[in-house]
Amino acid sequence: MASYKARISLSGTEHKIVDMVCSEIKEIASRTGVEIHGPMPLPTKKLVVPVRKSPDGEGTNTWDHWEMRIHKRLIDVDADERTLRQLMRIPIPDGVQIEIQIKS
């Protein structure tokens, strides 16, 4: 049976949902008996957008700061074909992006 190395990177704006998908991947790996490394948390990106409060430009300069955080996790799996098929069937919630790189 062919063995593959899969690197799964997850990113999303809500860390609880990203961690939930990571736990589903870990559960599939433990059921099939393959080796797993991770989830490794990567640095969180903070995107800040300063916006002027007054629309006309008159008055004092007051600003609102809107922030969005992007949380990332990285998982390495030594998987066979059966495990990869099960990983492809995981329901991914909205707001979570997943990328799978496979090396043979």
Swiss-Prot record:
Keywords: Ribonucleoprotein, Ribosomal protein. Coiled coil: none annotated. Signal peptide: none annotated. One of its GO terms (molecular function) is structural constituent of ribosome. GO terms for biological process: translation. Disulfide bonds: none annotated. It comes from the Archaea. One of its GO terms (cellular component) is small ribosomal subunit. Gene3D superfamilies: Ribosomal protein S10 domain. Involved in the binding of tRNA to the ribosomes. NCBIfam families: uS10_euk_arch (TIGR01046). Belongs to the universal ribosomal protein uS10 family. PANTHER family: 30S RIBOSOMAL PROTEIN S10 FAMILY MEMBER (PTHR11700). This is Small ribosomal subunit protein uS10. It comes from Thermoplasma volcanium (strain ATCC 51530 / DSM 4299 / JCM 9571 / NBRC 15438 / GSS1). The lineage of its organism: Archaea, Methanobacteriati, Thermoplasmatota, Thermoplasmata, Thermoplasmatales.
